[in-house]
A protein has these predicted regions:
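Walker A/P-loop
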Residues: 34-56
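Conserved Walker A/P-loop ATP-binding site and its immediately adjacent core
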Residues: 50-55, 64-89, 114-117, 278-280
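Inter-Walker segment of RecA-like/P-loop motor cores
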Residues: 90-136
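Post-DEXD/H (motif II) to motif III coupling segment of the RecA-like Helicase ATP-binding lobe
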Residues: 165-225
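Conserved interdomain linker/interface between the two RecA-like ATPase lobes of SF2 helicase motors
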Residues: 205-305
Length: 396
């Protein structure tokens, strides 16, 4: 291992909750059976899916030396996953796939990538053996060397409902890999799609492990309540522009009320209002001007992500910058980032897909560490601070 592969975790280690330990133990037992079934982890956003899976990988690798390939749907999740593994699992070696495939495979090594990183028809047609040179080992060569060393191969797919379709390039890659261990995780499972994929891949029906919402709420990982205000674009006599401004105005008022409640309670936390807008050239700037002119928000309090493509560094910087009280972002960059200090989400983008709605509502479901520290489990969290508020302009 070279010094550049020693990852310094940026987050603190997590003490497992009882439900997390129970799920990890059950998945480990299933994978270590003589015929390991594919395992699906169903769990709400914020429940610790990455943490649970990392414990499974560590336990399985201790019994059967295994090289793991872990795929996520969004580029900003690669670094988050690497950090979580480094913080919580001394027995695992997280490394980016692009770099790790040029190293010697070893037990507990976890190669991290987006699904798109291996989802290329050109590579598939060449048996994933065409992008090498004197300095770069192909993925096929790397996997073959690992198997020759006696290592088992494990595949982890985060947000499996997105990529695991028999017709997608990533689905075809997963079929080619033919992993000994197969773990899928999702907050919005689509069983029919997963079953179809598994059948095409020659796998048996998966074994399911679930974290209930009650377990996650009682562990103070998710807020207990959701309050949604929906402005139906079909029923209103207001113009679309007026409805969008109403959404922003009401969401900002709610965020400011929460800010005052936190100050009164002595909780050192500045709430963040998330504003999701449609993709387009001027949608972010239009929302910014409405917040400044109609709501009186100081420009310095507003953080913006204007690109159509996610920028993980920028998103994380704004989400963690307590001088910012608003983060405006486009639909295309609206999933796969953490913002624990967010209580309120405003969407001026018409939403008509239930699965996508649940994905972005998950951005305001987490309970921040200052709230958990201010209200230990023996004390109830005040309902207003234990609620995720969602303001939507919708067309159902």
């Amino acid at each position: 291992m070279s010094t550049r592969d020693i990852i310094a975790a940026q987050s603190a280690a997590i003490e497992p909750e009882a439900f997390q330990s129970a799920i990890a133990a059950g998945m480990t037992r299933a994978l270590l059976r003589e015929s390991a079934p594919p395992c699906l982890l169903r769990a709400p956003t914020g429940s610790g899916k990455t943490f649970i899976i990392s414990r499974v990988l560590e336990a399985v690798s201790a019994e059967r030396p295994t090289l793991w390939l872990w795929f996520v749907p969004f580029v900003n999740l690669v670094q988050q996953t690497e950090d979580a593994l480094a913080a919580n699992c001394a027995g695992l070696i997280p490394v980016m796939l692009s770099r790790g495939r040029n190293q010697d495979a070893r037990a507990g090594m976890v190669l991290l990538s987006t699904a798109q990183g291996v989802a290329r028809a050109r590579d598939r047609n060449a048996g994933y053996n065409a992008d090498g040179d004197d300095d770069t080992r192909t993925l096929a060569e790397f996997v073959a060397r690992a198997k020759a060393q006696g290592l088992s191969i494990g595949l982890v797919v985060d947000e499996a409902h997105i990529g695991l379709d028999k017709t997608t390039e990533f689905g075809k890659f997963a079929h080619w890999l033919n992993a000994d261990f197969f773990i899928m995780a999702t907050a919005t499972p689509k069983d029919e799609r997963l079953l179809e994929f598994l059948q095409q891949a020659g796998k048996s029906a998966f074994e399911s492990f679930a974290a209930s919402r009650d377990e996650v709420v009682n562990a103070r990982l998710n807020k207990r309540y959701i309050e949604a205000v929906v402005y139906d674009l079909r029923q209103s006599v207001q113009t679309v522009a007026d409805l969008k401004r109403t959404v922003l105005r009401q969401a900002w008022k709610r965020s400011q009320r929460i800010k005052k409640q936190l100050q009164i309670a002595g909780v050192p936390l500045t709430p963040l209002l998330l504003v999701q807008v449609a993709n387009g050239d001027k949608t972010v700037e239009e929302a910014e001007q409405d917040l400044i002119k109609l709501c009186g928000v100081h420009p310095a309090l507003i953080g913006k992500h204007s690109s159509d493509d996610p920028d993980p560094v920028m998103m994380a910087a704004i989400a963690n910058d307590s001088s910012k009280e608003v983060l405006i972002f486009k639909q295309s960059a609206g999933t796969g980032f953490d913002a624990p200090r967010a209580f309120v989400l405003a969407s001026t983008k018409s939403v008509n897909d239930a699965d996508f709605a649940m994905q972005f509502i998950g951005r305001v479901m987490r309970v921040s560490r200052p709230i958990r520290e201010a209200y230990p489990k023996s004390m109830p969290i005040p309902p207003d601070l234990d609620t995720a508020y969602v303001y939507l302009a919708a067309r159902f």
